[in-house]
């Protein structure tokens, strides 16, 4: 246990009220503030929440072994914005602190720390507006956040804090990038392996090139190309989301459903650029399958499953004729993925995404004879039609393209051969097909796909029935049925037909079974300044080279201008120009990569904001290690699998991770991917970063708008009758109420500092935890905070005389009365279970109920044996007050490390039991008997009950059935 100071914090300096009748030692906001400040100082000075590691700088200095019972609790760390915290932000932080404090009191070695996710676009944009360097802004914001979080009394190990912008931190972000860059995915082994092993296999002849070339005859450049194409990090000319208004590309997840940037609301355009990509798709199966191992909300698992989007089907090759002559026919295969190969006899046209890389090759120079004018987009040539169509749809989001009821498209002037029928079908481009899913080309079966039916109906294309079941002239039939109009498949059910045609395609070399995913590789470059630089340089030929690990960190240089080149938001043809390109002295370097000094240029992109948060849990385990990401012993202790505790399939990971559901896909999926690569390469022992996840709900509040829709300060609004009003420039104005988020822009934000000033931090903690289940959203109401405040005042009065400041507790020699003992131990049992299950709202309710009982039954003085357990149980919720009361009760050690009270099982069992008594199936009476009453006693008491006797009317029951502890049934 932690020794305490000899002085009593906050006690002798309590300020008397000006009202002579007021209690001098009442628990007020002022006294709460002094108590809280003093105890926070005590905890910091005495390092109360510092937790030891097995090895390294944080290991016990005396060489002792760390406790086996460990617990790693983690919050999704905050982005330190300039607005600071509002009362919605601490909800999860307080909940995890209560959880960590409870388990610390029960003897666990608890790791709970807090860092800051400090890279990102907001600081960069503010820097552009003000000329203040984003580092200065970020550091100031972090100081403010630490102050606000510090007031809440969170029991964090402050030695383990960091910001993702710290050079010592992002050195290891860059190191992880190099591990992924220098790795490849071995499909046979289903894991990542070092790229050096792949090169060795090529050198030895153990592995051959898939294109048939001889590795030994390749030039150095050709070999480098082969290897670069195998890496888990690679460059590709990919379709990206280009946002001219922000001057950068965005990941799919950073684009809204209506095709605009999530930040800034600028138009986003699909554009082909050469970008760094991470091959997350190699892990699609493992990311999907391992969800079953995780104790996560089913909603989050479903979101990840849908995002990964595994589907089974077949790849089919349609042969498109490019030219035909007497000498030869030039053809190109159009590869299509379909989940319904059984419908191939119903294919009447093909559709390619407008961005498909075959479009420019397939588009004809002239329209074929008798081309339907509706297919031409009003253009003189197919090329002109495709160009015009691409311009028309460039700003449409993927969601718009898929949900649009008005189908549009252009004929390419080419036909492809359906391998099932041997007949030609026209090839179109249309925006309802996306290049990011499957192959970016679909075989259209309008008889059995609603989107294909709409397209065929508009462009007067044939609609063929191949699944019997409905009239396809009115709408596509999407149900099950028997195959018709399908040659050798006729009469088969769907499943049988799928197997049969897939086998036929494989035998003919025109297709094969395949599993496809919606998941796309991760776009990993941003044209920004405020992010982690890439540890990549380029030679004079433009070939990338990874820096040696010894060259890390690559520090972010200071630049005079932080902005990428911004363009007209509607300029889809603009090209990105990153801010780091302006730091010419930093960009152009001379390095020796083993073949002498040569000129190189650094990569001028930066990593996305997700980079630091994809691994930060590992750094908490070993934050000062300058030699390694984290020592293996420390990672294994805090995050390694524990099959004896969690089952044989335990993947390991953080014991509890709490944060918002808005990160279900992005952050959590990326973190899982990085962690799995590190696991494959032997750097960590855990297969997953987070064993258990809980999504806290949101604290919401009312906001108010005037007649123009502008928000007005919520704290100035008052209600009169059924209306709401606030002061205006010319008197009162009516305003209109809406319910939702809390935010500065909505003018309904309440700072936790305000509540701490008015009531104290412990009151804020108790109020937020009492508002409802952690996972549920709940409305904020400042007027209700006083309820938590009064509860803490009642607890204070149980221990402290408000007039004299003396302790009211008495050391009684006798036992407590039976009812109080039973109430106490049931409270201990219930609160223990609630804390362990994060049911802090019901734990609070039980503590209030027990406090009310003591207040009512012990008006003069309270027995120590009754009040000390209350103080201990209160400690996770209101730690400052609990520490203060514990000290006033005469203890000289902190209660931060317990002991948490233990319930006596003898007081958890009822002495009596109430039985309902049925007569012929209907309850006719109730009896109360001793809990251990035997059958004969139960029968005798039931038959003697007055109400039961009325319904028996003198009859003797044929049967008396007793369901122990629940029911007595009489049958007459």
From Swiss-Prot:
Its main location: cytoplasm. The keyword Cytoplasm applies. Keywords: Aminoacyl-tRNA synthetase, ATP-binding, Cytoplasm, Ligase, Nucleotide-binding, Protein biosynthesis. Gene3D superfamilies: HUPs, Isoleucyl-tRNA Synthetase, Domain 1, Valyl/Leucyl/Isoleucyl-tRNA synthetase, editing domain. GO terms for cellular component: cytosol. A motif ('HIGH' region) lies at residues 78-89. It catalyses: tRNA(Leu) + L-leucine + ATP = L-leucyl-tRNA(Leu) + AMP + diphosphate. SUPFAM superfamilies: Anticodon-binding domain of a subclass of class I aminoacyl-tRNA synthetases, Nucleotidylyl transferase, ValRS/IleRS/LeuRS editing domain. GO terms for biological process: leucyl-tRNA aminoacylation. It holds the Pfam family Anticodon_1. InterPro entries: aa-tRNA-synth_I_CS, Leu-tRNA-ligase, Leu_tRNA-synth_edit, M/V/L/I-tRNA-synth_anticd-bd, Methionyl/Leucyl_tRNA_Synth, Rossmann-like_a/b/a_fold, tRNAsynth_Ia_anticodon-bd, Val/Leu/Ile-tRNA-synth_edit. GO terms for molecular function: aminoacyl-tRNA deacylase activity; ATP binding; leucine-tRNA ligase activity. CDD domains: Anticodon_Ia_Leu_BEm (cd07958). HAMAP family: Leu_tRNA_synth_B. PANTHER family: LEUCINE--TRNA LIGASE, MITOCHONDRIAL (PTHR43740:SF2), LEUCYL-TRNA SYNTHETASE (PTHR43740). NCBIfam families: leuS_bact (TIGR00396). This is Leucine--tRNA ligase. It comes from Mycobacterium leprae (strain TN).
